[in-house]
């Protein structure tokens, strides 16, 4: 009997999902992206070689895996072709192993232009988007005016829709944001220069998935970003534009919630966040700088430095609630090597003095929130690359156990380095 497993971030993204997806893909037939776009940077280190995937599922590096892009993903033709070119230059067969839902909304140049214009206009109050047009593309989807992959099959109808949409966007870009308009003919020509390649990969993703389940093969769903960036459940408005939570598997791939057998939440042994928004345990001292330096905390897509802080059990408890998380994979434990003491946030003190154990929903409700910490002893031993659980320092084992107690979910996988071999699988999601 095959298993269906979802892997998702349980913090603010950048938890190390790409490595874990790649690690587990030797067990599966299909790897599926179900939300987000090329704003997701999944970094893989295999035999010392670094690969960053932004749009194509991480399973593409395994020859026996078919990769699917579900309807919940916003697809940039330009980004797709660039990523395909990079992979094919390395000898990886993409075109025969990548299938795309025809219901995917397209990201086009006017979405990118609008993204940049809005962030520039907001100034210091900007959301902190990646500037890749993700939000505006999702806006068009909800407004029911967006162009989709299916529209590539009729160039004349596509051109008519494109003209109407560009009239709307260019009016705003020129008259409100005072920037250059997007050229209609260039946009049309650029899209249709690659349309045949994309059309050749179109498939009924939902039917493929349900056939695979009937056949008893393993399926892995690859989430992007993190739970606390979810459009509905994150620190709104400092969120992404898609559902980064387990529910996105149903809406973004047509695979119902009862069909998921296991949800693996990825957590760092500490916390990071890119961009603006609440971050209760953020460190502004030497400890934060040390974590950032040792953890190489820079965005895979943007290169922006990540904000760093202590592990926030309150936020992760919220992720457990929202996603029905079965087990965790903890990454970057080795980054905490050498700290004399470590802190875990166990509760929040609200501005009115109330002590709460669950995270607020809206960003405004985080204002004035103070972390309540529990201090634990650190360890001086080196844990980098350790692959036997019993070989870890006792203080590290105690730290992991305490986090398990606070969030109510076991750590089933432990990562002590960037390479796929630097991992301990304590309980296999496809066997559990």
UniProtKB/Swiss-Prot annotation:
Any one GO molecular-function label of the UniProt entry: GTP binding
Transmembrane parts of this sequence: none
The UniProt record lists the keyword Repressor: no
Keywords: Cytoplasm, GTP-binding, Ligase, Magnesium, Metal-binding, Nucleotide-binding, Purine biosynthesis
Amino-acid positions noted as binding substrate in the UniProt annotation, renumbered to this chain: 300-306
Cofactor: Mg(2+)
Catalytic activity: IMP + L-aspartate + GTP = N(6)-(1,2-dicarboxyethyl)-AMP + GDP + phosphate + 2 H(+)
Positions annotated to bind IMP: 14-17, 39-42, 130, 144, 225, 240, 304
Recorded GO CC terms: cytoplasm
Cofactor stoichiometry and binding remark: Binds 1 Mg(2+) ion per subunit.
EC number(s) given by UniProt: 6.3.4.4
Residues forming the catalytic site: 14 (proton acceptor), 42 (proton donor)
Record: residues binding Mg(2+): 14, 41
Principal subcellular localisation of the protein: cytoplasm
Localisation: Cytoplasm
Domain of life: Bacteria
PROSITE patterns, alphabetized: ADENYLOSUCCIN_SYN_1 (PS01266), ADENYLOSUCCIN_SYN_2 (PS00513)
Pfam families associated with the record: Adenylsucc_synt
Entry keyword annotation includes Oxidoreductase: no
Binding site for GTP: 13-19, 41-43, 306, 332-334, 415-417
Gene Ontology process terms (BP): 'de novo' AMP biosynthetic process; IMP metabolic process
Function: Plays an important role in the de novo pathway of purine nucleotide biosynthesis. Catalyzes the first committed step in the biosynthesis of AMP from IMP.
Family named by the database record: Belongs to the adenylosuccinate synthetase family.
PANTHER family named among the record's database cross-references: ADENYLOSUCCINATE SYNTHETASE (PTHR11846:SF0)
Subunit structure comment from the entry: Homodimer.
Name of the molecule in the record: Adenylosuccinate synthetase
Gene name of this polypeptide: purA
């Amino acid at each position: 009997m095959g298993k269906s497993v979802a892997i998702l971030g349980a913090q603010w993204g950048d938890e190390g999902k790409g490595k874990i997806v790649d690690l587990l893909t030797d067990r599966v037939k299909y790897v599926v992206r179900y939300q987000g776009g090329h704003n997701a940077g999944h970094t893989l280190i295999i035999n010392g070689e670094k690969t960053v995937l932004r749009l194509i599922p991480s399973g593409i590096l395994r020859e026996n895996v078919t990769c699917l892009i579900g309807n919940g993903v916003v697809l940039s033709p330009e980004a797709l072709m660039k990523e395909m070119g990079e992979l094919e230059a390395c000898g990886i067969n993409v075109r025969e192993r990548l299938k795309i839902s025809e219901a995917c909304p397209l990201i086009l140049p006017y979405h990118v232009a609008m993204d940049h214009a809005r962030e520039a206009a907001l100034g210091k109050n900007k959301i902190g988007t990646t500037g890749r047009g993700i939000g505006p593309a999702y806006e068009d989807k909800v407004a029911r005016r967006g162009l989709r992959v299916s529209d590539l099959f009729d160039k004349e109808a596509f051109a008519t829709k494109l003209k109407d949409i560009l009239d709307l966007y260019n009016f705003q870009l020129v008259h409100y944001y005072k920037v250059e308009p997007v050229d209609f003919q260039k946009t049309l020509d650029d899209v249709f220069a690659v349309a045949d390649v994309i059309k050749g990969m179109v498939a009924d993703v939902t039917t493929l998935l349900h056939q695979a389940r009937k056949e008893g093969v393993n399926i892995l769903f690859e989430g992007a970003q993190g739970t606390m960036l979810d459009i509905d459940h994150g620190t709104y408005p400092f969120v992404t534009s898609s559902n980064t939570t387990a529910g996105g598997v149903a809406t973004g791939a047509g695979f119902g919630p009862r069909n998921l057998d296991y949800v693996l939440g990825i957590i760092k042994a500490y916390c990071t966040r890119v961009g603006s928004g609440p971050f209760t345990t953020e460190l502004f001292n030497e400890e934060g700088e040390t974590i950032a330096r040792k953890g190489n905390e820079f965005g895979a897509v943007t290169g922006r430095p990540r904000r760093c802080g202590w592990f926030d059990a309150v936020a992760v408890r919220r992720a457990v609630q929202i996603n029905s998380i079965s087990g965790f994979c903890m990454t970057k434990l080795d980054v905490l090597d050498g700290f004399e003491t470590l802190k875990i946030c166990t509760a929040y003190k609200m501005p009115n003095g109330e002590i709460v154990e669950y995270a607020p929903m809206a960003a405004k409700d985080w204002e004035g929130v103070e972390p309540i910490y529990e201090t634990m002893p650190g360890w001086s031993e080196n844990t980098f690359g350790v692959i036997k659980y019993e070989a870890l320092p006792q203080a590290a084992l105690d730290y992991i156990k305490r986090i398990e107690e606070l969030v109510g979910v076991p750590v089933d996988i432990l990562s002590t380095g960037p390479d796929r071999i630097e991992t301990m699988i304590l309980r296999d999601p496809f066997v559990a």
